[in-house]
Structures are given as structure tokens and as C-alpha cells.
Amino acid sequence: MKLSKFIKIPLFIFLAFSVNIPASFAGESDSQLAAAFENQQSNLQIEGDGIVSKILPDDTNGSQHQRFILRLTNGQTLLIAHNIDLAPRIDDLNVGDTVQFYGEYEWNSKGGVVHWTHHDPSGRHEAGWLKHNGQIYQ
């Protein structure tokens, strides 16, 4: 049975808006992060999300950072280094949780690091954030 164009367009619109698409468009950010990793790029503002695969001890040298590893849908891993001197810690973080992020990507051989996931008190750097269980940490 062939659908007329008058049925196809409303059906397409209905289907397009009934799908639960994450706000970060994970596929797009995953491909941006994969390209940044492959090209060894740094200093990129990026938004995305991933699943916590490992929780690491805090880095307490200099500014304190909460650290954990996210696995993206494309398999790439990212170290999240979240400055807990400037932003609240995610206290209820567990392996398997989803975390959305917006921050600065820095290349390394293990997949990269995202930092600047907080506000900048001096206002010179774009503010970043983490989102976990509906709460934003900035």
C-alpha cells in the first residue's frame, strides 16, 4: 500500500517528535570527540554524555578535582576532571550512572580529558557543567 504525501508528512512529523532524543545529541558529540581524539586536538568546548565506567580517587594536588571515567556510546572513554573547589561534588555518583557534560576537551592517549565543568569566578572562560540525575553541578 502506498501512502499519499499528505499522510507521509504528518506521520514523519509525529514520529520525529515522539522519539526520545537526548538533549546532547550523543551521536553528534561522540563523532566530534572521536575526531578530536583521532586528530589529537585540544581546547575544544564540547557537550555530550556517557556512562560512568570507573570512579577514581579525587586529585588533591592543587585544585581538588572529582575524577571519573565515562564511556561514550562509540566506546571511547573520557576522564572527567570536575573542580570541586569551584563546583559541588556529585556525591551520589555510581558506576553505571549516566552523566551529561559540557566542558573543555583535552587530548590524551587514553581518550581525552574533559575539564572546566564549572563556572569561572573571574569570567574569562566559558562556564561548563555536569548533569547527573536531573541536577546540574556548576
Give residue ranges: language-model regions.
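OB-fold and OB-like single-stranded nucleic-acid-recognition modules
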Residues: 23-138
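Compositionally biased regions
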Residues: 5, 19-21, 25
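Bacterial N-terminal signal peptides
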Residues: 10-20
